[in-house]
Amino acid sequence: MTFRFSAKFVATAVATFFAACAFAYSVTDAQGTRFDFEKPPRCATVVPAITQNIFAIGAGEYLLANSRYCDFPEEAKRKIKIGGYIDPDYEKIVSLKPDIFILPATADSRVARRLEKLGIKCFVLHGEGIANISADVRMLGKLFDLGKSAEKIAADFDDAVKPVNSGGGRRAFFMFGKMAAGRGTFAGNLLTACGLANCADKIGRPWAEVPREFVLAANPEIIFAECESEKSRAETERFFRTDPVWRTTAAVKNSRICFVPRDTVIVPSVRVAEALKIMRAFLLKN
């Protein structure tokens, strides 16, 4: 009896041990859902920022597919395309059988619900915002078992985006074409991080085409503008210098117009640090 009991006990202990080892690690997403993994999961996403952060921490090999808008880094272009943010190709996603589909908290909940019904688990990151970028990087590090490299990238990012009063409270606009980034926008937060006063905050809307009388009253001392090419940069600068209202502003008169590469300011990924570096360097010189 003693031998039988011992054998049974050992068998149970061994089974329990291997059952416990079946899940090598667990990760909890931004919504508090726990996921258990034996190894780094194969994933898919339709969000450019998530794609960029996945590659930034060295987890690109686990990304099966992304959206048609995911074009950075170069390797991202070679991934299978599964539609876009508002029109994901559900059939193709299911056919790829990813372990998880990664979405931000701001994503349309209907997308997650439909994917869940199709048997695809959704891992949710935080919402948009400079403060959430490093949090998402750290979470992705845990997700792909790359915590050490992710922590370094997140820490470097946190250090890079610490508020610095290089702007001295000067009045500024961040322009996207003829639209100004106002309160609560990602680009507006960049102005705050530079120690600038965002003129567009007083408009009361996140995005607005600035009325001429408002431009005159605001009289910005600094203008930041996104550009995607030398051609768009030249066209935008020509607009500011020839427009009867904008050309009267202190910013234009003193040639304080700074152009920032579009892809560093429209995608809330770790590349935002590049935009801030450009902006702060300009402010220090001007």
Residue ranges of predicted features:
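A short, structured surface patch at a secondary-structure boundary
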Residues: R42-T106, L196-C199
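His/Asp/Glu-enriched short active-site or ligand-binding loop at hydrolase and phosphoryl-transfer sites
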Residues: S67, F186-W207, C227, F259
